[in-house]
Amino acid sequence: SRGWDAVILTGSDPHSSEYPSERWKQVQWLTGFTGECGDVVVTPDHAGLWTDTRYFIQATRQLSGTEVELHKMKVPGQVAIPEWLSSHFSKKPVRVAVDGLCQSVGDVETLEAALKKACGPDGFEIADIPDMLEQFWADRPAIPHSPVEPLDEKVVGETRKERISWLRAQLKAEGCDSMFVTALDEIAWLLNVRGKDIDYNPYVISYLLVTPQSVTWFVRNVDEVPQVPGVVAADYHVLDDAFEDRKAETGRLLVDPSTLNWHVSKLLHRHFPDLLLVRGTSPVIVRKAVKNKKEQEGFRRAFIEDGVALETFLYWIETSVKGGAQVTEWEASEKMSALRARIEGCRGDSFENISAYGANAALPHYSTPREGSAVIKPRGLYLIDTGGQFTFGTTDTTRTVPLGRCSKLEREDYTLALKGMVDLSLAVFPEGTAGCKYDDREGSGYAGSHRGDGDN
């Protein structure tokens, strides 16, 4: 009825988050697929999910009985979304609608370039329909708003003022005056604040505008946000007015197209001429990765204390199943989380635990079901992929352990994976070696087998 030939939905949010809140799990709501990587294309006669090797088995199971077809990515003969759209529609232009709030500028430009190549420069149109599912998703969750928790400099090793001053100096060195920050982890780092707006991630859903004169934090429920010294809180939904009000003090504005969503980008272009909009990689990314002494101490503490919880868990599960207890994968996952929760400063898990036994342990990114998960037996292999969020650090640890006698194939695969990991850990690479070369070396002992994951 709107003249669209196709709708493209992604599994991200307005901040290009890897883990979106429940409100923006559009792919899951539409298809039932719960994997972290997936794009959906809907046309008048077709619905398809594009995902990679990590989720082929999961997607096949979850899409069974639906009208959604699985399209496999990162395999020989793959047909990407733009090429598929071009071949599916004979008439041109192809009219494609996207939710501009959940598509980064970089993603839309990649789509435009691919469509231009597949359909010709005049063979397509892309429409921005922000929150397009709002009218159909009756019980759609609201944008979350959790309490904001400022972090003391004793925990992070730097004050908020020091980090903002560093950013302003960095912007000046790069020929810019201001920056519009959209990635939630970067905002949390710059302001030394934490929240619980997204499961497993201690973030506050917000935007941040840093100019030479002011720092404006666009958040939900402004009146409930505690005062943050040196920061002015503004409403999350009034970006348009704020850009106009601060135009005079902003000057040359740096934006990162990999995290800036397309819809907000168009708002910026409405208020700032192209000459004043500078595209580039956020300087916060690298600076945030270089840990100061206090942060290093925090990470070491996190892994030590979380390691004790993990060792306690592994002892518990081994003695429990060998003692005849009926322990399911889900129950084991809950036990691991409970042991971690005892640690002072724990903010919960850093991602959904992967608790997998037997054949399930071989599945890339297995999702442990609450109901009907496998019973763990005193034989074969058990995998636990788990991590925690603490006020002083974040952990992520994977362990595959034999719980008793293993099959010949299990012993061979376990040994080859271990040898590959040892080989990789001892190897010396020239500076600048691509990450895919590491994968080639680590998997060299697999005798031609293909695992399709990264959790060896």
Model-derived features: positions:
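Active-site neighborhoods and metal-handling regions in enzymes and metal-associated proteins
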Residues: S1-N456
